[in-house]
Amino acid sequence: MTRARRYVGLLMLAAGALVLAQEEAPSRTEFTLTAKAFRYSPDRIEVNQDDLVKVTIQSEDFAYSFAIDEYRIVRRVPPGGTTTFEFRADRAGTFRFYSNLTNDRAHADMQGRLVVRSK
């Protein structure tokens, strides 16, 4: 009887390990956006839910910012400089990213989309 219990216990442990191994680990995704002439390029980023996303933004002319309200992200990019940051895309949906600088109308029109595909 003890051997049978041990055997069943080992089978259950192996089955649990198999289930854990089959779960997908979050992917690491990297993007480089160029900010130039009040535009982001690319202006659309697509990731999977729970991905760890690394974003580098390069300014080719002026100072810019990058904001995604739903993820509480706000970063500044100096003229001709870069900024890099990471976040976990833990919410599925489509989210607007934009420059939140208010010194002129051109910044207000600078935007793009982050698409987070659900699991």
What is each stretch, according to the model?
Residues L52-Q58:
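Short edge beta-strand/loop segments characteristic of extracellular beta-sandwich folds
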Residues M12-A21:
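Hydrophobic h-region of N-terminal signal peptides that target proteins for export
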Residues S59-A63:
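Short proline/glycine-enriched turn/loop motifs at strand-loop junctions of beta-rich domains
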Residues D43-I45, R72-R76, E86:
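Beta-strand-rich interaction surfaces with strong enrichment in secreted/lumenal proteins
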Residues Q22-S27, V77-K119:
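Extracellular/periplasmic metallocenter environments
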Residues M1-G9:
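Bacterial N-terminal signal peptides that target proteins for export
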Residues E24-L52:
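N-terminal edge beta-strand
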